[in-house]
């Protein structure tokens, strides 16, 4: 997973981690742990993040499956 690209995408979309956490139904602290590689992002969470950040399929594949 390319966490730096994911973090850049969050900023690019003008969102904070708290805003993204709300959008995907997670606690902010949980999302912070996932973004700092202490916990894995699940497939379901990746799908919700993809929608919240308006990613194309190609962007999501590049970020989550690389």
Where are these regions (language model features)?
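Short C-terminal boundary/hinge segments that cap the last helix of small helical domains
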Residues: 54-66
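Append "Primarily bacterial transcriptional regulators
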Residues: 20-21, 31
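Recognition helix of helix-turn-helix/homeodomain-like DNA-binding domains
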Residues: 26-41
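Alpha-helical residues within the helix-turn-helix
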Residues: 22, 51
């Amino acid at each position: 997973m390319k966490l730096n690209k994911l973090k850049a995408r969050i900023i690019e979309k003008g969102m904070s981690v708290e805003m993204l956490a709300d959008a995907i139904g997670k606690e902010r602290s949980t999302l912070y742990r996932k973004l700092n590689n202490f916990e894995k992002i699940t497939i379901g969470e990746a799908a919700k993040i993809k929608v919240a950040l308006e990613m194309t399929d190609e962007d999501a594949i590049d970020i989550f499956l690389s």
